[in-house]
Amino acid sequence: AYKLIYQEKKSIRLAEGMTLTSRLLTEEAQQRALNCLAVYSHIIEVQKIKKVLAVATAAVRNAINGASFLKRVRMSTGIPMTIISGKAEAALGFAGVSHTIDQKDFLLFDLGGASVEISLVKNKKRIHSISIPIGAVTLTEMFQSSREVNQDKIETIQRFIQNVLSKVEWFPSEPLPVIGIGGTVRNLAKIHQRAVNYPLPKLHNYRFPVEDVFEEVRMITGKSYEERQKINGLSSERADIIIAGALVIQEILRKAKATHLTISGCGLREGLFFHYYDPI
């Protein structure tokens, strides 16, 4: 058995400022990450941790200067970090979910800042997976949707997402349960919990109807940046990237013909631990 004794999480937005043409991690984003990892390095030292598992995902994977950034991480913090493939990222997200949610057949998505991983699971086995390089941060930057957006802009983003998803040929033809991982999906769940006065402060395995998700997306996209910052349940620091992220989730749910969305509070980080502790 294992026991969780401490956890810490920080949103860095490593992909911020990285364009499809330049594909460079900006100095500002790198510095934010290095500052955060310096704190984690101190925690590792104080707690006398012997084994450290550290991986870098889409932002570093897609960046031309990703490898040199990881050298900086190693030199300044001592943390050895490995870039993982989109396939490995999908596998670890699945491990985080499969160990903590009892569901046999489902569609799983993990929406991050620079990519979304989608997996089709049958009888608790991943039969298809894909990593698509569109995330809440990169889409926001691509369409400049961080502040006010009009209906034309929303429809342009939707068409772009639909076009990307149309290339995934193995989407289930029959409706399947859909499980979501990531900060955007957790925020949508928090907004829903506040709206229905949900009595528990628990997001993991929280389930709500897709009609409510779509209603939330309509509400979010209809508000100004300042108004979004005041939405009950939405982290104010996510108010600028929530539109792009919410539209990705909406289009995945539509394509999957889903009736409900289930939230997993466990994802890649937990999957990394389970893969080490109990490989499947």
Model-derived features with residue positions:
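Dinucleotide-binding Rossmann-like beta1-alpha1 core, especially the glycine-rich loop
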Residues: 54
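A structural signal for short, well-ordered beta-strand segments
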Residues: 8-12
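Helical "lid/coupling" subdomains associated with nucleotide-phosphate turnover
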Residues: 13, 17-47, 57-105, 120-123, ...
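Conserved strand-helix element at the start of the C-terminal RecA-like helicase core
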Residues: 50
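Beta-strand initiation motifs
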Residues: 1-5, 125-127
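A generic, well-ordered mixed alpha/beta core segment in the N-terminal half of proteins
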Residues: 105-119
